[in-house]
Amino acid sequence: GLSGSGKSTIAVELEKMLNEAGKAVYLLDGDNIRCGINSDLGFSDEDRNENIRRIGEIAALFRDAGIITLVSFISPFREMRRVARERAGEGNFVEVYVNTDLQTCMERDPKGLYKKQIKNFTGKDSGYEEPLVPELIADTKKYTAKECAEQIFDYIMM
């Protein structure tokens, strides 16, 4: 989903639920990765692809260690999501589309990103390719973050 759609909020709720269920879990979020390992990347299509590629590699390392990895990022291109799914391996990737319209995201704008003049910002002047067949769709206009997290929790625990 777009910036402000609720991805991070849902992921934090889901992380709590998984921890309470005794699962080893780690949350990779756009904020902590963009400020660290991917701080050298901008927002060009090439940099966005590299951002998601690196995240996919990191998530695979966590998976190899037996840790459930929650990945909360703007992933604007279907092809990169396909590559990340492939890298994760069969049965190890659940795509959740946090479907929130642009206007709502702009109204929420918790980080003030829509107000900034960021070149190639997803949803503003750079496109977002909606998933064609995600495993789950989280509608944050209709449901709370906790309700969305519960839906995801139920799906991955079945």
Predicted region positions:
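Conserved beta-strand scaffold positions in the cores of enzyme catalytic domains, especially
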Residues: 27, 93-95, 135-137
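Helical mechanochemical/support elements of P-loop NTPase systems and associated helical scaffolds
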Residues: 47, 51-54, 80, 144-148
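Small-molecule kinase domains that catalyze NTP-dependent phosphoryl transfer to phosphate-bearing small molecules
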Residues: 99-151, 158
